[in-house]
């Protein structure tokens, strides 16, 4: 079952997964929309996406899947719609906004804070942060990410509580 994206102020509640779909890798975020916080997040190879979402579904029933409408989203919808209702969100510009959102969550420290934000490069892949941006766009409000920033080049997993 597929439904269009909700207007700002969506009343989604409970546990929701967000997916920034891609051909080779996907950003995934699991959030408790009732509490307004991120539970966990990962960047996984595309072929591991369904397995990760099914594992989350077994732990806590998903109320919805929020997914970007770009790269191969129609293909992903067919694979994921059995887990929960899929709600598409316009993903235009989310990669650039994910970079800004990264620095909002984890402000630069030391000499890096002297660099203009546009010149700062986050120390991890941003696919999970892009999934966060998609979910926040859909909800019309920011979510709280209470864990330390991801670190290290080539990082595949974004830590969460």
Walk through the language-model features, giving the residues of each.
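Phosphate- and other anionic-substrate recognition elements at nucleic-acid/protein interfaces
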Residues: 1-161
